[in-house]
């Protein structure tokens, strides 16, 4: 009798185990699928580039401001990126803590209102670049922007500034650099001439060079694209971009901007 009872229990356990195995297998498969979905979502999650400006560009040249023109070019070229425009006149000077925290690359164009940017915001940007690897791209007159000067730690001044009808031939100095991928030499019919030397730290790379031609025919060299690593972050400075010229609508400049964003973005 006892033997029959034990056999019955063994048969019951065996049946339970057989019933449990498919359920456990199904649960395992479901778990793997769920994890894969999460991973795929993370891999496809949009990265974020914020294009900031101060709303001082003439509307006859830039109807949607300079940040709008740059953003338009980036949206056409960057896949898997969220492109956000921000302005000094917005709440939080355009960059809330939440936006800054999710920003992979910050593009900055400023001219007349550098002093209006809060020191608190500058400190937060510096921390995001140096300690957390956010990329920073400074354009033209933003050599005097407070975040850029903070990152460089130097006066960031040029010898002279002349918007006198000077033109420039821009040449690709390093064709193997990610910023110059697909870029050919090109010319701008007008540029505000920034005379060397440029009071910044020695760059890790000069990817674009320029040759100014003054109205009297004289020529003068000038660097157009400079790169640094500052802490954990990458920094790029681009010399063209005067507010009365249509530089940010030009295909060559738009390609450089898109390439620079991808180069400056932290690895994930």
Functional labels for PLM-detected ranges:
Residues 55-58, 90-92, 111-115, 142-147, ...:
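Solvent-exposed loop/turn segments at secondary-structure junctions
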Residues 39-102, 261:
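Aromatic-Pro/Gly-enriched surface loop or interdomain linker
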Residues 131, 136-174, 179:
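Hydrophobic, well-structured mid-protein blocks that either form specific transmembrane helices
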Residues 43-46, 51, 87, 215-222, ...:
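Extracellular ligand-binding/catalytic regions of CAZymes and related secreted enzymes
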Residues 3-28:
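Bacterial N-terminal signal peptides that target proteins for export
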Residues 51-52, 99-146, 232:
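Short alpha-beta junction capping motif
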Residues 23-39:
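Bacterial N-terminal signal peptides
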Residues 75-77, 81-82, 158-232, 237:
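Catalytic beta-strand/loop cores that center a nucleophilic Ser/Cys/Thr
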């Amino acid at each position: 009798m006892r033997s029959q009872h034990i056999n019955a229990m063994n048969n019951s356990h065996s049946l339970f185990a057989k019933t449990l195995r498919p359920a456990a297998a199904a649960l395992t498969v479901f778990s793997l699928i769920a994890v894969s979905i999460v991973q795929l979502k993370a891999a496809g999650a949009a990265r974020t580039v914020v294009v900031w400006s101060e709303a001082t560009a003439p509307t006859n040249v830039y109807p949607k401001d300079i940040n709008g023109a740059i953003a338009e070019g980036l949206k056409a070229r960057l896949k898997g990126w969220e492109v956000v425009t921000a302005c000094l006149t917005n709440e939080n000077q355009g960059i809330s803590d939440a936006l800054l925290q999710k920003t992979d690359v910050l593009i900055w164009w400023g001219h007349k209102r550098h002093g209006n940017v809060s020191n608190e915001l500058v400190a937060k940007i510096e921390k995001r670049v140096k300690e957390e690897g956010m990329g920073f791209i400074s354009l033209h007159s933003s050599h005097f922007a407070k975040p850029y000067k903070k990152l460089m730690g130097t006066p960031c001044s040029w010898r002279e500034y002349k918007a006198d009808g000077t033109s420039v031939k821009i040449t690709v100095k390093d064709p193997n650099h990610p910023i110059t991928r697909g870029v050919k030499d090109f010319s701008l019919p007008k540029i505000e001439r920034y005379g060397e030397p440029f009071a910044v730290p020695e760059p890790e790379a000069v990817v674009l060079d320029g040759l100014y031609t003054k109205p009297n025919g004289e020529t003068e060299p000038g660097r157009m694209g400079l790169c640094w690593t500052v802490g954990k972050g990458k920094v790029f400075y681009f010399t063209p971009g005067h507010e009365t010229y249509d530089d940010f609508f030009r295909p060559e400049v738009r390609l450089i901007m898109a390439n620079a964003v991808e180069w400056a973005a932290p690895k994930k």
